[in-house]
Amino acid sequence: MVKKISLITLRCCMAILSFAALNLLASAEAFAQDDLSGRVSGIVTDAGGPVIGAAVMVKGTANGVTTDIDGAYSLSGLKSGDVIVVSIIGYETKEVAYTGQAKLDIALAESAEFIDDAVVTALGIKRSEKALSYNVQEMKGDELTAVKDANFMNSLVGKVAGVTINSGSNGPGGASRVVMRGVKSITGSYQALYVIDGIPMFNFANSTDASNMSDQPGTDGVADLNPEDIESISMLTGPAAAALYGNQAASGVVLITTKKGVEGKTTITISNNTSFSKVWQMPEMQSKYGNPAGSIGSWGSVVNSDYDPRNFFNTGTNVINSVSLATGTQKNQTYLSVSTTNTNGILPNSGYNRYNFSGRNTTKFFKDKVTLDMGASFIMQDDKNLTSQGLYYNPLPGLYLFPRSDNWSDIQLYERYDSALGYSTVFWPYGNDGVGMQNPYWVQNREVRQNKKKRYMFNASLTYDITDWLKVAGRVKVDNYTNRLTYKLYATTDAIWAGPNGSYRDITSQMNNTYADAIATVNKTWGDFSLNANVGGSINNTVYEMLGYNGQLKDIPNFFAIHNLDMTTKYKPQQEGWHDQSQAVFASAELAYKSMLYLTGTYRQDWESKLAFSNYKSFGYYSVGLSAVISNMFNAPRWLNLLKVRGSYATVGSSYDRFMTKVFYPYDGESNSWSSSSTYPNLDLKPEDTRSWEVGLNAKFVNSVNFDITYYKSNTYNQTFYAALPAASGYINMPAQSGNVMNQGIEMAVGYANSWGDFSFSTNYTLTWNENKIMKLIDSVINPFTGEPIKMDDKLEKGAFGGLDAKVILKEGGSMGDVYGYHLLERDYNGYIEYDPDKGLSLKNEEFYLGSILPKINMGWTTHFGWNGIDLGVTFTGRIGGIVMSATESYLDQYGVSKRSADARDAGGIKINNGIIPAQDYYKVITGQAAYYTYDATNFRLSELTLSYTLPSKWFNDKMNMTVGFVGKNLWMIYCKAPFDPELSGNVSSNYYQGFDSFMLPSTRNIGFNVKLQF
């Protein structure tokens, strides 16, 4: 369940279990005590009326009942002096002496621990769910580990409303794309901010060459975390919830709370998750027709080859082991964990390995007035040959387009020893043919790309409770990593990528991030009013450095060392670096009245180093909100457990990219010289400004049903783009600002949870609808040299797709994902395709709208059934709307290896109007034309399936709990018209390359098992 199980739901579950057990015991007791005559009855109540399902027992006996729907109970067989014990989850247990009275009403007081659900919100502070004026969704850590993924964010797909998550197509450990409430910025970041235990984390990515030709997609910072260390995750989808975190939170926040030690006991947990991956969604290809002599394309006669590209792929394995220790006393609690993640990919000689070591200690001293909380993590990661898509460093072009008449076993022997050269050379008699074709086995074994990363994190917080209503806290976090990226391209690799003796690239990058803040908190109550307020300041400092070398090998083939690089021709030293710092002050306040009205407000002022040379050195933003608990304002019926309405308004600023307000001098590795920037600095740039409001309703009914719905709308102003400058200015362009991008939508979650005896059932459905629209794009821009307006286009071209004639083009009235094509088959005045037997088909040059890569609706449905330790869980997910495009399908048609092209040949050709044209002639014309390779992205699938059994603890003398289970992921694609998995992302770092397939690695179906032991 996304929402924390409510107190009322827990009470209902306990009531049903108690009713079944206690009434059986009461019946048995009655047979044994027929001679007893003492009888008492009454009603159990709380401040709101009768309490249903409370356990009423005679202390020290099995004589007991549960209260009925009116809170009534009746006990017999009592003796004077017996003690009646009344208990139910959420209330303080009450004991009352029996003195012979026939009537005894008992009033219960709610337990302070269960007065209200609490969720973790901004700054890591737990707040009453009733008080929140914005939407927050919380998931427990157990929901992330049921079906483990090397990147735990992929486990959230379909389980959180308002969040779109795309898995990277490069397999386990790859970065994920997380977008909340739509894409807001033309040039800025759209990714959510990650916050660990209240402290922001810099979510760096170690990918390179991020484009539709990407060769090494890499991972990101959040993928390094061990999901077993996570206690809970809160998703703050709106700016009102995230306003205190600064400009990085403009696109929402993922709040991660990690585990602590446990007071009073020692718990050791050991877990293993092993899964196996097979290629799932893959293009349909043919092996019936072969290639004519001297041709690569398979447009020849029937050969009925047994070639099957699927045989190239391995069965991938993903093994995750974890051991943790939680222990503690009242004064000191400790948590330690070790985790290993070892993955072999579906591509030969590819994999991902990660090793996590974590510890956390919480100590109280000075009469429990001071709390010191310290944590540390060390992570080692090694990934090899991660491949996403594109023509470069990708085995799939050669694999898919391989001529069907030829012998694949010759290709499997990918290198042959050349006695004249003295080393082995590649065997691939076809060349790259302009589409990056290489021997797939050579790519995986002799074009080796590897990342090795070491990362350590340290955090500490010191809290001093000055009084019972005032405390101060200071926090610091250090997050550093070193990453080494190497490319080893062996001699005879295609000359596009390597020199005659091979090529070598060796780059080391370092990132050092330090965050610190100080916060004072007031929590005071005056009669019916209460105040919770925070005021503080923070500093966030990030330094990045990269140094490396890239070039062809000179003297010794296949000797990969810096001193063997060709220093005269193709030697390219590489060095980059930047230093960002932000400073801020912030405040928040929550005023409550009688636990039914909550007024909240926040304010933050930022000073950003990126703005240092502009005329606007800082920027401020705020939020206000109101929450009204209607069910607490009147005597609500018993079936209505909670009814809350809420609303909020927020503004959040977001800084633009560095180096836009100052001339800088980049180094040109080709000419070994410095050059001035081609971009004129604009000192009048302002931060992006997102203004958002939302209204929502939260309700809980009949102790089992919860319903949450939110409507939101946001507008993001000060969009940054580039305006062209005349050549006489000495610059090419300058940054300018304008625009207004609107997102509006609905987030909805509906859940039900109940139990009957040994059987339990829970279900949760989430739905997100988002509309993205560019309300305003470009204003006039003034030439800073002449003072005259610069003529601007009424559109911005943001992304082109290699292999297809399509671009993402932004226009007023359109969306941030609109795709346009440029060629269609010529048609006559009657709408028929024009075909001249002598000239063939022809194309018409015209810009036309293909659709948007942004989905309209995301949904998910998760259900759990439990019985006597057996748990069955299923998750269905779906997306409606949007388009995807496939350059892969275009290439398959061009080379005659698609099943579609074989079917056309079987049918005698392609039917055009009333005639038939040869299939090869038809596909030759439409190859590369996006209009014919665009597909609906709508899809529905059985995303996850879990079946587990918790063995009875008595089997282990009550000293151990053991759970074993079966897990599956991507088990059934219920509906999908696209020829590849439309939810995979070949490039998670850009909005403008979503929904595009260029020899993308296929998605996988994963099946495995898990074991968990707890001592």
PLM regions and their residue ranges:
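Outer-membrane beta-barrel transmembrane strand signature
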Residues: 196, 301-326, 331-341, 414-465, ...
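Surface-exposed loop/turn segments flanking beta-strands in extracellular/periplasmic regions
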Residues: 287-305, 392-442, 487-502, 545-573, ...
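Outer-membrane beta-barrel transmembrane domain signature of Gram-negative proteins
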Residues: 298-326, 330, 499-596, 649, ...
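C-terminal beta-signal and terminal closure region of outer-membrane beta-barrel proteins
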Residues: 674-675, 738-743, 787-825, 902-907, ...
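Short, small/polar-rich motifs associated with maturation and membrane association
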Residues: 2-16, 20-359, 364-365, 370-379, ...
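Conserved small-residue
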Residues: 269-302, 388, 548-550, 736, ...
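Extracytoplasmic gating/loop element in the C-terminal half of outer-membrane beta-barrel translocons
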Residues: 309-312, 496, 567, 608, ...
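Transmembrane beta-barrel strand/turn architecture of Gram-negative outer membrane proteins
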Residues: 161-162, 177, 229-232, 249-276, ...
